[in-house]
Regions:
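Intrinsically disordered, low-complexity linkers and terminal tails enriched in Pro/Gly
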Residues: 1, 28-31, 113-118
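Short, acidic, Ser/Thr-enriched surface-loop or helix-capping motifs
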Residues: 12-13
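Structured beta-strand/loop patches that form or line metal/cofactor-binding pockets in enzymes
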Residues: 1-8
Length: 118
């Protein structure tokens, strides 16, 4: 059986705040940096989700808003693929749309153009 590895290296300041997030994947053969990471793991014994959410001081609030919005949309897509629950995934996308509108990331009929004043 083939195995792949994903590795995260987090550099912390003296207050244990992430300064730098680096990650690599054995299949990608390169190392990348990121300002934020969200990891969710299913604990079978506890039947609960374990979460690791980290972001650096360099992550701007507008970037964080976009990061969360895109995660909501990605979760809807993954949920639909994993469960076949089309209607529930639509409801998740609808929530993500309203969330994006509230944060002025998207208009009622789509995304604001990049660089717009919203």
């Amino acid at each position: 059986m083939k195995q792949s590895e994903i590795k995260f290296t987090i550099s912390l300041d003296e207050k244990k705040v992430p300064q730098n997030i680096e990650w690599s994947a054995s299949d990608a053969n390169k190392q990348s940096t990121s300002k934020a990471v969200m990891i969710s793991l299913w604990d079978t014994e506890e039947r609960n989700t374990l979460r690791i959410d980290l972001w650096t001081k360099d992550m701007m609030v507008d970037e964080m808003k976009q990061f969360y919005h895109q995660n909501l949309l990605s979760m809807a897509d993954s949920f639909e693929r994993a469960t076949g629950e089309v209607e529930a995934a639509k409801a998740m996308r609808h929530f993500a749309q309203e969330f994006g509108e509230r944060l002025k990331l998207v208009m009622r009929n789509g995304f604001y153009p990049p660089g717009s004043n919203k």
